[in-house]
Design a protein with these regions (language model features):
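Conserved class I S-adenosyl-L-methionine
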Residues: 63-72
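C-terminal motif of bacterial Sec signal peptides marking the signal peptidase cleavage site
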Residues: 13-15
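A short acidic, Gly/Pro-enriched loop at the edge of an enzyme's catalytic core
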Residues: 125-136
């Protein structure tokens, strides 16, 4: 066989594989955020949550199987569902009251959202086998595990077990002052970044990337809402299962 033909076939196959495994483009992310059927409440929330850099930071791919922990009203859940598309799936975990997420899932554009009512200590439903998930997200609620009495070590181990090797665990939260750990979770609703990182890494995760797009170095971090009013200092961490 002609060696140039073989070389061309190898390059073509590699290119196809790259396209299949590649993350969605910034143009596609902009289209997702601008989707006309997104709610007015979500669009208002965009101003604070900055969905475009967040989705780009996560590194989403079409067809991913993900779980959004503490999904609440489903703001992040819906964005991820739009990104992974109908060939993917997004489990929306909540400890109770899944009605708002169930309402979102009625939209055909995000009908692949699966509400899951599970405790934080044991968030992964039995239909998800070990090494099955591509992505787990937890947006601005890890700190709440402190005053809620959640067994955080058990939670982190459960997330680790559910992810595929190479799977990602993306955590965002409100930044606390050095030395405060999780002690201000029920008052200022903040957590020390280094403390969170240490707990997650203890489950076997490795820190892959830090996102700075929600940082505000002018926030003194001594109140729940900064005074004078300003954006909170918030961190975003991407962990990977080796």
């Amino acid at each position: 066989m002609n060696r140039w033909f073989v070389l061309f076939a190898v390059v073509l196959a590699a290119g196809c594989q790259s396209m299949q495994s590649g993350t969605i483009s910034r143009e596609r992310i902009a289209e997702i955020v601008a989707s006309p059927d997104r709610s007015a409440a979500d669009r208002t929330n965009d101003q604070r949550r900055r969905p475009e850099p967040m989705l780009a930071f996560i590194g989403l791919r079409t067809g991913m199987v993900a779980m959004d922990v503490s999904a609440a009203g489903g703001y992040t859940t819906e964005l991820i569902a739009r990104a992974v598309g109908p060939t993917g799936k997004v489990y929306a975990q909540l400890p109770r009251n899944p009605q708002r997420v169930e309402a979102r899932a009625k939209n055909p554009a995000v009908g692949h959202i699966v509400p899951v009512v599970r405790p934080f200590d044991d968030p992964v439903p039995p239909e998800i086998s070990s090494n099955a998930l591509d992505l787990v997200t937890l947006m601005f609620n890890y700190h709440d595990f402190g005053h809620l009495g959640v067994d955080r070590a058990r939670f982190n181990r459960a997330v680790f077990a559910a992810l595929k090797p190479g799977g990602m665990f993306v955590v965002a939260d409100h930044s606390g002052r050095p030395g405060t750990g999780i002690s201000e979770s029920g008052t200022l609703h903040r957590i020390e970044e280094a403390f969170l990182r240490k707990e997650v890494e203890a489950a076997g995760f490795e820190l892959a990337e830090e996102g700075n797009f929600l940082r505000n170095p002018n926030d003194p971090r001594d109140k729940e809402t900064p005074d004078p009013p300003m954006p909170k200092d918030e961190f975003v961490l991407k962990f990977v299962k080796p």
